[in-house]
């Protein structure tokens, strides 16, 4: 990696109150001195101090600024760092950066500041990946999970598991090198118990990835129902604006409508679908087929029943789509005379052989009644109703999950080798495979190409 001094704009490229140009590297202070005019030289002021002055391009004043000076290694990157706080217009920030680059800095690559923090030991790879997750978080849970990982929750848990693995690996290797003084007789049972404990810990982390994905990507939510059941009205209420056209004409929604909403700290990626019914209209039929496809991939199905009309064969088709999904059934139009009851719905569910308890809620989309109960029910169905980031660790990253799965498979091989009575060096091989897989999460067992690929996904200036 280049150790030259880099610079980039660290704030968004939009007109705003303040813009920040960050400089990091061995010559950050000297380069800042070449463009900064104030009462004192940047190279002479104490670390972690802020100074008022101007950025100069020769004799021309570019902007009035506050400059933050930080000496390494007590910085984000571990290097000498200067952050120039200027006015936030896109042109003036670009001019400040241009002036800094003319003074000797190199334009930073995407994610290069965080990459340097990783390479300089300021954070491990799981924490580095959490940086981008903080930036891209779209709800409270995603943010808190990312902050927890940035503070070292994943790093510490992986470190704990790796220490157990390397302890047993070291014992076996030492015993094989010095059999006269160290015996491995009976050690297989000790190792098997330890391996089973590690597998349980890995399983817990792997299982957390489902919650992690939902926190990060949102709940894929599909609204199903017959035509004119009130699906589009429900979407409009949840979205807080008129996203869908609502009429008394059946089949108004022919294609899918997508909307992202925030619900009590969660993100719902909602898809409003065409009403499920038998139709000869080619376009509407395509919409119905699409609705069925989306239902298969959904994390959550909200089935809207028009409680003022009797159930029919179209409802039977919808019941077939929801039996293996997390589902909330809404008895809509509770403000009218209703003919469909919760008992009738539960009887239909029972006839389908569904054992799980499906929430059934009476609502009126027209009067906006029952919506709060729907929100509370959805939250309770996901993330155990609420989450604690004090002790729980959540995996939100597919790369990390794959590494955990690989480590678990290696530990299963250890147990297989023990049960099969294979030589102890077989145990050691699989233990080290698990150790290396977990090292991929923290970055201790990862190649330069993968490091470059990970950081290339970061935004400029971070």
Residue ranges and their predicted role:
Residues 284-308:
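Inter-motif core of Ras-like GTPase G domains
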Residues 2-9, 13, 37, 140-262, ...:
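C-terminal-of-GTPase-core extension/linker across diverse P-loop GTPases
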Residues 88, 238, 273, 305-308, ...:
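Glycine-rich, N-terminal phosphate-binding loop of Rossmann-like dinucleotide-binding domains
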Residues 51-63, 67-71, 251-279, 297-300:
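Switch I (G2) and immediately adjacent beta-strands of P-loop GTPase domains
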Residues 270, 304, 330:
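Generic enzyme active-site microenvironment
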Residues 16, 48-50, 297-301, 324-327, ...:
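Short glycine-/polar-rich loops that comprise or flank the Walker A/P-loop
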Residues 1-144, 148, 152, 328:
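A glycine-rich (often HGG/GG-containing) alpha/beta subdomain
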């Amino acid at each position: 990696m280049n150790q030259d001094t880099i610079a980039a704009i660290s704030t968004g490229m939009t007109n705003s109150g303040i813009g920040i140009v960050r400089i990091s590297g061995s010559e950050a202070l000297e380069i800042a001195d070449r463009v900064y005019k104030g009462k004192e030289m940047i190279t002479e002021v104490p670390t972690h101090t802020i100074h008022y002055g101007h950025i100069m391009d020769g004799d021309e004043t570019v902007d009035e600024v506050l400059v933050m000076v930080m000496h390494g290694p007590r910085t984000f990157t571990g290097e000498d760092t200067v952050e120039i706080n200027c006015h936030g217009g896109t042109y003036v920030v670009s001019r400040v950066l241009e002036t800094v680059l003319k003074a000797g800095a190199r334009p930073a690559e995407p994610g290069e500041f965080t990459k340097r923090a990783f390479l300089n030991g300021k954070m491990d790879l799981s924490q580095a990946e959490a940086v981008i997750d903080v930036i891209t978080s779209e709800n409270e849970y995603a943010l808190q999970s990312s902050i927890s990982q940035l503070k070292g929750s994943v790093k510490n848990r992986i470190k704990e598991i790796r220490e157990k693995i390397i302890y047993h690996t070291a014992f076996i290797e030492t015993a094989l090198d010095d059999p006269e003084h160290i015996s491995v007789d009976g050690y297989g049972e000790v190792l098997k118990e330890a391996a089973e404990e590690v597998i349980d810990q890995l399983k817990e982390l792997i299982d957390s990835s489902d919650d992690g994905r939902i926190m990060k990507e949102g709940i894929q939510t599909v609204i199903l129902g017959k035509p004119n059941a009130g699906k589009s009205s429900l979407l409009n209420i949840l979205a807080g604006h008129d996203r869908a056209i609502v009429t008394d004409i059946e089949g108004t929604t022919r294609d899918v409508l997508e909307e992202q909403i925030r619900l009590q700290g969660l993100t719902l990626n909602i898809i409003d679908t065409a009403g499920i019914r038998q139709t000869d209209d080619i376009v509407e039929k395509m919409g119905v087929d699409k609705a069925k496809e989306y239902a298969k991939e959904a994390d959550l199905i909200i089935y809207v029943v028009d409680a003022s009309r009797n159930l029919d064969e179209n409802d039977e088709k919808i019941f077939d789509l929801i039996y293996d999904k997390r589902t909330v059934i809404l008895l809509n139009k509770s403000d009218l005379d209703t003919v469909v009851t919760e008992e009738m719905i539960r009887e239909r569910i029972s006839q389908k052989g569904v054992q799980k308890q499906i929430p059934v809620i009476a609502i009126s989309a027209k009067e906006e009644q029952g919506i709060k109960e729907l929100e509370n029910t959805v939250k309770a169905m996901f993330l155990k109703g609420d989450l604690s980031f004090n002790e729980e660790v959540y995996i939100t990253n597919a790369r990390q999950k794959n590494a955990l799965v690989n480590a678990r498979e290696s530990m299963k091989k250890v147990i297989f080798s023990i049960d099969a009575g294979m030589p102890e060096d077989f145990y050691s091989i699989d233990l080290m495979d698990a150790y290396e897989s977990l090292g991929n999460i923290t970055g201790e067992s990862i190649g330069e190409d993968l490091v470059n690929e990970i950081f290339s996904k970061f935004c400029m200036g971070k």
